[in-house]
């Protein structure tokens, strides 16, 4: 069976799968502001699964906006763990907050569930290769001074970087900002598809409903399709895949049965996805599942979202044959195109 051990921040690692936490946090903006730095630098001593008491544990003050921003950080953390002292006034249930914050909390908690395919793959990578999900910005550019000047920025897996908001909204603009170092290349906003040129420091401003999460060009991000939302922990029959323009890219989705030894290759199934981009256009391929296909659905529906690519695909094929039942739609949120394929055999 898979086991884990929850240990406090003062403890060094003494278990194969430790889940650390930053201690009994106070309910203050200052405490929230420390958590992104504490979370990312925990990776420096092998604490890849690091958590914090989302919303704060005790003392401090009541602030609904603070809770919303802390939940946003928690969703883009290794562990998403809402927690508080045993006090009826400190509960973290979304319905205990004002309507706006309740909506924000619910939306982000659902987003966490969507992210499970990506997160599960990244945690397998951490187990096999020792590369933590959350990494400080200087991990990839250790010679770059700017990466040390943004302690609250971090990479979130291979495809994303995060710059949490830890300040209150400006009462005039209704926005709050986060100092951000954008690495070289083109990066896209995870929530709205806006493109940013990298190699510079910027202040990214967002309302209460969003936070700065950027995706590198050429990325492929597998998500659970939340249509007909449920709390199932089974490998999803419907996947939503975000495909970003620019460079060619590749992502290998890894899945297992969830209750088998993770160190044995025969317990895993992999699905390789590639995107090739050149002057002739973009080709996106989902290869047939490889490995223990019994642990994943035998048929899957795919919702492919091409961010900032508005042209309708010239052709969709399955097993080399034109797939005439493909559905197409405009993706207004990410300024692109959606392609839907239903009930595709896993070995196709």
Q: Could you tell me what each predicted segment is?
A:
Residues 1-2:
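Short, exposed "boundary/linker" segments that immediately precede the start
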Residues 5-6, 344:
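Hydrophobic beta-strand core residues of beta-sandwich domains
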Residues 7-210, 214-216:
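Catalytic-domain carbohydrate-binding cleft regions of carbohydrate-active enzymes
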Residues 81, 92, 96, 106, ...:
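Context-gated lysine
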Residues 157, 184, 279-281, 334:
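Residue-level signal for tight coil/turn positions that link beta-strands
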Residues 188-208, 315-343:
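Solvent-exposed beta-strand/loop surfaces of large extracellular or lumenal domains
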Residues 213-321, 337-347:
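Accessory, solvent-exposed terminal regions and/or long lumenal/extracellular loops of proteins
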